[in-house]
């Protein structure tokens, strides 16, 4: 546990240089809940010029920290988000990060802790009642790093009716569909007591599968159509999390589900690559919130498509309409 807290500190330090001169507001509150033990320390960021009475609600970005981290991680993340806003990568947004320990943001099998329920019920309710943020799916976004990448991906995959998009960075997931197939490479950093405290003792393999993003995507891909999905991992990840990320990417690709995937050359699990990668993730959110209207229908694109469609006709290949929610597979 102490070692993982040290790694979380490294992540925070990597983001700290941007934290100086924060123009928005960052506060810490405690949210009471019966779903988890005690109250939850939570960091909330509002952007420069935040107007609680603005006619248009602000997008809400839920951020989930990594294992060993806490809401203190928001210090650096808020500054990097503010940089993304100032660069025009993403609209001015409100963001929130709860402290969740090493819970995996899971509803525990034995019912003693319900972190997923806390996020979907208590956290969302707190933000929507107390801040001028989106109260519907559109404009409600979720992201996270490492354990938070796993949590954000799982929660969004299980509840695509709640979230417009998810940006999962180096998610702590394994490249398997069944628990019994997990290899030592993908679990050396998770001890059995931790897994059993969350998934049951012994681990309830069906419960694990029901909460595994890869299995969810494989078994029910149609539920993900229309969900903005962004996946990121460094190819030098010390926890080998790029293998699990690539696995989910391949499932989504083979199922024809539109998504964006980045395997970042030379990037590690922690360190200076996190800032530019987080900015890329926020740029993805920006494109989801304000889709470019000419990427598929600009005049030059239409002209080129007309020519290519003629090639298809001559070859007897079917011509299907463009659907940005799906990969062009046929």
Stretch-by-stretch model annotation:
Residues 20-330:
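Non-catalytic cap/lid and distal C-terminal segments of serine-dependent acyl enzymes
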Residues 1-8:
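Bacterial N-terminal signal peptides that target proteins for export
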Residues 8-16:
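Bacterial N-terminal signal peptides
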